[in-house]
Regions:
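Extracytoplasmic
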Residues: 8-42, 60-63
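Short hydrophobic/alpha-helical segments at membrane-entry points of transmembrane helices
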Residues: 13, 98-106
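Small-residue-rich segments within alpha-helical transmembrane domains of MFS-like 12-TM solute carriers
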Residues: 21, 25, 110-118, 148
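Residue-level signature of mid-helix packing/kink "hotspots" within the transmembrane helices
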Residues: 25, 52-61, 148
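Juxtamembrane helix-start elements in MFS-like secondary transporters
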Residues: 41-49, 98, 136
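Helix-to-loop junctions at the C-terminal end of transmembrane segments
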Residues: 59-73
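Structural signature of the two symmetry-related core transmembrane helices
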Residues: 76-90
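Cytoplasmic helix-loop-helix junction between adjacent transmembrane helices
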Residues: 105-141
Length: 151
């Protein structure tokens, strides 16, 4: 795996970013089914989407204020955030419609996205210094596709 990262850093990070950011609007992508099965209102979708955004803001501010992204390896934070985000997202399925637990899990997903989106940018710049501009363009493209993936 390490050899693959060294030989092809850009495809590895942009694909990881694609799948990592798919957590962002995963609930929105299945909302019609969720609302029908659980009888959730449209306002619940707004609450759950807001929970993710709030988690992301708190997470990015925490990373900035504490300097965690500079004290620990960006790839480790990215990995841990991706795994924990996937677990929080999967946990949502078990408690969908149970307020406030569902909101807390979506908030946790947002916190984890703070370790995926900005740290992915840090990784792509560090791993591809000779073509950072093009690499960032690929990364932003994957961020956009990743957030649209659930739809």
């Amino acid at each position: 795996m390490i050899g693959l990262l060294r030989r092809y850093p850009l495809p590895v990070i942009v694909l990881a970013q694609l799948f990592g950011t798919s957590l962002w609007f995963s609930i929105n992508g299945v909302w019609l089914s969720l609302s029908g099965e659980l009888g959730l209102a449209e306002s619940d979708l707004g609450r759950l989407t807001l929970s993710v955004q709030a988690g992301f803001i708190v997470g990015t501010l925490t990373l900035a204020v504490t300097g965690l992204a500079d004290r620990f390896g960006a790839s480790r934070i990215f990995l841990v955030s991706s795994v924990l985000g996937a677990l929080a997202n999967a946990g949502f399925v078990l408690v969908a419609g149970v307020f406030p637990v569902d909101s807390l899990l979506r908030f946790a997903t947002g916190l984890c996205l703070a370790g995926i989106y900005p740290l992915g940018m840090k990784l792509v710049i560090a791993w591809t210094p000779n073509y950072a501009g093009a690499a960032l363009a690929w990364l932003v493209g994957m961020l956009t596709l990743g957030t649209a993936l659930p739809h």
